Regions:
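Short beta-strand/loop motif that positions the catalytic acidic residue
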Residues: 46, 52-54
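Alpha-helical scaffolding within the catalytic cores
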Residues: 34-41
Length: 120
């Protein structure tokens, strides 16, 4: 069976970790503003590419953290598609005061398009 993972925040980190653990069954991985795995040896185990949707105004998972993730994925020989939105952490949560409708809709469209392409 093919496995696709999607997660937000802590779940975004778990999405990446679950895709690593899924091995050859991993078909797609979407992570919304989750802390990336930093260990290049772990990233080498990925059997799918990753769509990373990040919050450009985020302070904890900063643009530096995202750039390091990009570099580590390249070192691991893995494909990463990154998009950073002009929004803060939690932008896709409608119950959050910093909810950003435009960023949420754009991220959702990217995620759905990616998942459809990977799960044919």
């Amino acid at each position: 069976a093919k496995i696709a993972t999607v997660g937000w925040c802590f779940g975004g980190s778990l999405s990446l970790k679950a895709s690593i653990l899924a091995g050859k069954q991993a078909a797609a991985c979407v992570m919304y503003y989750g802390m990336p795995v930093k260990d290049v040896e772990q990233l080498k185990l990925l059997q799918t590419d990753v769509l990373g949707l990040f919050a450009g105004k985020e302070k904890f998972i900063s643009t530096q953290v995202v750039a390091e993730f990009d570099a580590n994925m390249k070192l691991a020989g893995k494909k990463l598609t990154l998009k950073s939105f002009d929004a803060d952490h939690g932008f896709a949560n409608p119950s959050n005061p910093i909810y950003d409708k435009a960023s949420t809709e754009a991220a959702w469209d990217m995620a759905i398009t990616y998942l459809k392409s990977k799960l044919k």
